Amino acid sequence: MDLVKCPEHGDACFLKTGVRDGPNKGKSFYVCRTNTCGFVQATDIPVSHCLLHEEFVVELQGLFLPQDKKEWRLFFRCARTKAEGKQWCGNVPWRQDPNPKELSVTSKPQQPSESQLHSPSQPRNPFRVLNKNQKTLERKQFVEEGERKTADKKLRENNEQLLDQRKEQKPKSNSRMEKDPSSDLVATRQSGGDREEQEKSKFQPKTKKAEGMASKQGHGEVLQGIPKGPHMSESESRGVPNKPETLREKETQLLVPSVPGQNPESKVQKEGHVSREPLKNGEAPSAQVTQRGLAQGPLQGPSKTWRPVPEAPAAPELCSGMAHHATSSSEDSEDDGVSSRPGSPLLFDSTVDSQKKGSLQHSDQSVQRQMPAASGVSKKGDSSDPAAQRANLTTQLKQKKGTLAAVNIQALPDKGEKLLKQIQALEDALSALALSPEQGTKEKCSAQEPEQSNITKAAAAPLHLVPPQPLPRPLIQPASSLGLKAGRQETPEGASQCSGGHMNQHHLYNVWKITSEAIDELHRSLKSCPGETAVAEDPAGLKVPLLLHQKQALAWLLWRESQKPQGGILADDMGLGKTLTMIALILTKKNQQKSKEKERSEPVTWLSKNDSSVFTSSGTLIVCPASLIHHWKNEVEKRVTSNRLRIYLYHGPNRSRHAKVLSTYDIVITTYSLLAKEIPTTKQEGEVPGANLSVEGTSAPLLQVVWARIILDEAHNVKNPRVQTSIAVCKLQAQARWAVTGTPIQNNLLDMYSLMKFLRCSPFDEFSLWKSQVDNGSMKGGERLSILTKSLLLRRTKDQLDSTGKPLVALPARRCQLHRLKLSEDERAVYDIFLARSRSALQSYLKRQEGRGSHHGRSPDNPFSRVAQEFGSSVSQGCPAADSQRPSTVHVLSQLLRLRQCCCHLSLLKSALDPTELESEGLVLSLEEQLSALTLSKVDVSEPSPTVSLNGTCFKAELFDDTRRSTKVSSLLAELEAIQKGPGSQKSVIVSQWTSMLQVVALHLKKNRLTYATIDGSVNPKQRMDLVEAFNHSQGPQVMLISLLAGGVGLNLTGGNHLFLLDMHWNPSLEDQACDRIYRVGQKKDVVIHRFVCEGTVEEKILQLQEKKKDLAKQVLSGSEGPVTKLTLADLKILFGI
């Protein structure tokens, strides 16, 4: 790698090597460090392999020149480290100066082997391995170099401590340390003025220099554990152990900031040993710190050896405390510090307080001196008074307990054992201090004893800590967070405790580890999953026998309630009897509960003392749309033996608000809208659903009950996790959670995340983790989604075959009949006028999007005001605001809507649009536009005009009357008459997305003496169920009129076998849902689906668009035909023929 600088920013560029399959695999490019810079320069440097992970290719390299240094260092990262979300694998000295003109001194190779590796004849690539022997040599050299650097660093650190202690005590030039009775170690201090002067001249300038550098940086960083290779002097080499230590690779290393002004006494002691860690797996040139003991140095006896101490990753909250130890070694700062100039990305800063630096050793020593006598640490040399010690220990204890309260210890690799030991040690020290008030006097008597004795003894004697005691439950974070929310906890001042960005390296590793564990757990649970042929017996008390696929589903449901998380998603196709399957589950668990009721000795679930839920119920809470609340009640009453299940409808103004009463019922049924009104949804950042409800939340009765299970019917109603309904549902408490929906994914994978959040499927109920680990568009994310769906979701379709090759459900035949119609001459003339206007509006909109045709002085064409004026209404003329500049997207979509209405009936052009219909179209109108739309239905009737002028063309006014038969209405009536004359008793269902169109059809049905009933949004749930029952009865009405939105879900209209779709919608799943109202379990007759399409109109284009959307939706989730409801510009061009 050569030094290539960006011509724009002047910074040294990174060397990027392609590792993924594609045209750039194996090729290398120089790229600028700045993300927004587009500088790229190709190079012919060959592919390299990582020194730490030999089987992986190095994909990123970078040159960094540490501040006040003349030796460049080359940082490298391989594909494995990048996949783990870390920054660098490590770094090596760059032996040859990449820019000799800029640097006055060229770094020379220190060993012949290294110079051979980087000879000028080879490419400038320190990782290139030509054969196996050379690779082994280079790795060995990398390891040995790290050992020399670590030993060098330890010696300088301890010498610096010795010098600072001498300064504090002002020792004589010739002095000896007395052997302490409580220690077996005898340490001698070097004597002689020459030796002392030599040490002072060696260490003092470096200390001052490092302090100055840290203060200049403001937030200077310290790199510890990075292998480096300066020459060691004779005096330094004396402290190097004879036998080199092997390089230890940690699985993770903390990215530790130094928080300004924080108490350095929060440093976590490591039992007096030195932990030496090399840089691994991409911990960046950032402030990585390995913890060291304070008093390991050349003063120890020869029998003592340097040995590393295994160290578990600490919680993010511990970072700030450990960071201060980085300032105790100024030599590290000088040798390893990387310049924090603005041109160096990947680096973050931390402030070093010079006063903290001076007092750090003393405060850290006091931590070990304050341990109780049982720890084997002598307190003789402690000159501080007991009050100061007590205050010091109390402060540390509060910090540790605060950390414990904020961290989910179960997510830590050591399960929080280290933190618990520290808390126990601090509590013991406080107890010992309270029992020995005369300790301060003893300390004063021995104040003249050299302080180094205590330091040495404290470091040499390992701490014997009392085993951790069990913690009270309220201190433990709920298990659903799994440490992820704790990883983003912030200090009271609002500053993040872990620098390096919102997702720092330790948190990224935590995310990766927890995700892997959760996926592995789900994968292991599949081993106990019942097979496709496994069935469960019909529960006692069920009046009707279950079909085979329902018995198989029941076996799966019972299995899921024994797994974690308890519950899942039942996503069977619409019409396969999901309601009866869930009723069978409730009845089965009810029977099991009766048989085990006497044996149960423990509560159903654990409740904390701060939890407002005081009633544990064995019942089931069912949440459904208001249109289905009576449907559920009727299904239970019809399918289950009387008095088996007690049902309560939590709905209406007279509902019971006593949680204790509700907890006694077997089934409580309520609606989504009622939940959203009753349950407060003010959600704070990082709040766990259902944990510690707010004060106002205690007034909601449904929150005061812990249910045996919650069932969300039509669960796609909570597909948006940010809406009030979704948040309220997630706050409910239950042992098992079920989502029942025929379309688990309607728009995108965010719909699936909403269900994961409701199921509390940790850790995938955390949005940031969901986006980074599942919904990231990668192959690995797709694999994780596949594991989730296999474990948590059961879906069968009507056309699915069982193991024997037979259909899963025996349903009658279904055929679709497409009626192609031609508009009459008058209808075609009106349609063409609207088409020309719509096409012009879209073209001008496209020009504005492209930046070519922005006409600021011209108001856009408002279709509502234009049509209102043409039908004789002058009200819109009094609303100049309606003609002001509006978003063109609204106008284009509204023009498209009017075009589709032209194909159905021209009278729809005069009627106002229902707000729910506008919402389904994706239209959000301003108040002026809504008022303008209302004027369409208020035509002046006092002076009726015989003609209507549209764009200069006059048409007869009777053409727009609702009493006139349009082409589509005429074809519909002809089909209905043919059905009435056909064999047997056949009924029809007519579906339209516009209630105004249903009113026009009803008018003509009445003229033809056909009985009908209408279900739309204005019909209350009780009347709706009565109409459904009447229609399914043989003596009921012949025709049922339903709106696409209000009647598209949850209705069982098996009494009819003909379904007419009057208009086309680009959301095909809405139409499929409507078709499933008649084509479902219980249908005995052959089903015919009638579609009307007017030739040469926008409806033909919509039909093509529907097929495209269906093909895309099938690729999202197997069997899930979820739509994409938004129209793109490409779609609009197709619809308007542009």
Curated annotation (Swiss-Prot):
Residues 971-1133 form the Helicase C-terminal domain. It is an enzyme of class 3 (hydrolase). GO terms for molecular function: ATP binding; ATP-dependent activity, acting on DNA; DNA binding; helicase activity; hydrolase activity; zinc ion binding. One of its GO terms (biological process) is RNA splicing. It is found in: Cytoplasm; Nucleus. Disulfide bonds: none annotated. ATP binds at residues 572-579. Residues 104-124, 351-369 have a biased composition (Polar residues). Residues 135-182, 192-202, 267-280 have a biased composition (Basic and acidic residues). A zinc finger (GRF-type) spans 6-46. PROSITE patterns: DEAH_ATP_HELICASE (PS00690), HELICASE_ATP_BIND_1 (PS51192), HELICASE_CTER (PS51194), ZF_GRF (PS51999). Zn(2+) binds at residues 6, 9, 32, 37. Gene3D superfamilies: P-loop containing nucleotide triphosphate hydrolases, Tandem AAA-ATPase domain. Residues 559-762 form the Helicase ATP-binding domain. Its main location: cytoplasm. One of its GO terms (cellular component) is spliceosomal complex. Keywords: ATP-binding, Cytoplasm, DNA-binding, Helicase, Hydrolase, Metal-binding, mRNA processing, mRNA splicing, Nucleotide-binding, Nucleus, Phosphoprotein, Spliceosome, Transcription, Transcription regulation, Transcription termination, Zinc, Zinc-finger. Residues 90-396, 846-866 are annotated as: Disordered. Belongs to the SNF2/RAD54 helicase family. This is Transcription termination factor 2.
